[in-house]
Amino acid sequence: MMSYEPAEPVPVEEQPILEKLIGIRQRLAVLKRDRTRFIEKNEVFHLKDELVEQMNLLDSRRSTNSTRTIVDSQLEDCLHLLSLFYLAIGRNNDLPAFFVQLGTVRRLLEYNLEGACYTQNDLKPLKERLERIRAAIVEGSKKEDASPVVVKYLNNKLAVCDRNYSEAQHNISKISPELIGIQTRLVSIHRQIDGFAVRPTSDPGFIDRTMEQLKEIEEMKDSNGMFCDADHVPLQGQELCNGILEECFSFLEDAKTKEGLSDEMKSSPKLQQIYHRLDELLNKLKHLTLTHRWTLRETDLYVYRASLAEIDSMRIDGQFLDEQGNAPAGQRILLYLLRRCYAYIYQLLSSSEPVSEELMAVHNQLRTVKRCLLEVQRSGGICSERDLYPYQMKLASLENLRVNGKFLASDHSVPEGQELVNSLLTQCHQLIEELRDEKHQHDIEEREGSENTDGNL
């Protein structure tokens, strides 16, 4: 289960709903684990219909101020997993596909607010993503098969993200324009220190170099420790910038003397285990960003999100506690690892193409052909028509897979992503024609140059 919150008593009238949700989640999990075949979209649609039925029942039996129970946790688990299935079958623009995206954006915004170490550049892509989701919800709600309860649920989740974004935006909008450059630089240094704390031996000269940068920023303050404008008037945003600067000095000392983990963290097997789990998750997600086009089924991300949610739920008032119930110093590194893991999940979700996994192999091959042709074009073009033969043969072999202009699945159904794949195919043919035309033009210019030279002789 992805959500790990204290269980509240489930009302008697919601018990049947809980049992149904547990059953749906188990079937989704079984489908997720089955790697022997491609995911069939009709199975996903059927499970979605069953889930919507339970959402309608729950919505009809609840008031707006109902206490959150395990029913909500099970529902969110089902919705997040269902959302990943929609991405896996290429239905990226259908409403259920946005549940997991909204959940990830919310997490990132919460971590930004908690750490108070972010810039406008961090918020901008999240805001753009929220606006795209908002537009998709509006468009999706107009369709005949749109479920009102799904639209309502998505709008509620969107509203939470909007509130978090507004708070995050308000916090940095108070920074004076003259201080924005310093704040941006401090945030960058802070993240470099966090990264170094995780890999303390990766750059032996990092500590001295970073200390010099921090001292340089420290010297920009006046004798009263304030960042001021040309008229010696203290700039707005002092507290935020000074807070980040002090944290940078403190964390750099920790990284210098304690190799990333504080003594208190090192003395707690429980916290060391959390650290190593997060570090392992980060490395796996980082690897996925390099290989996902060929190896990732979007539903695989559920396991990572579940692990992160479990770890995050261990915090009490934002702090991880050791075996004695104390919150040791030096926990910033754990928050950094959590945030980085969610950032990689967000990156993987954002890069998901609206193509069914049945078509993904063809899609990836066409992307590779296109990338190779573009590289040939950038490198000066072809030397002869023969240079194009391998690309033409590859395109021909892929085109031969089509039946009546469609790429079919093993059961002869038409998988999602036809337009995108056919568009890539067309682009590859256009690039071949461009390369051929460029070669032809080059030959003409070369002949004309040769004739002019002969004439002058």
Swiss-Prot record:
Task: Please verify whether the record's keywords include Coiled coil.
Answer: yes
Which InterPro entries has this protein been placed in? Answer: UPF0662
The record's subcellular locations are: Cytoplasm; Nucleus
- What does the UniProt keyword field contain? Coiled coil, Cytoplasm, Nucleus
Coiled-coil spans are 119-174, 418-448
Has keyword Cytoplasm? yes
Q: Which GO terms describe its cellular component?
A: cytosol; nucleus
**Free-text function comment from the UniProt entry:** Involved in bleomycin tolerance with links to DNA repair and/or proteasome function.
Entry's family note: Belongs to the CUB1 family.
Protein name in UniProt: CUB1 family protein C30C2.08
Source organism per UniProt: Schizosaccharomyces pombe (strain 972 / ATCC 24843)
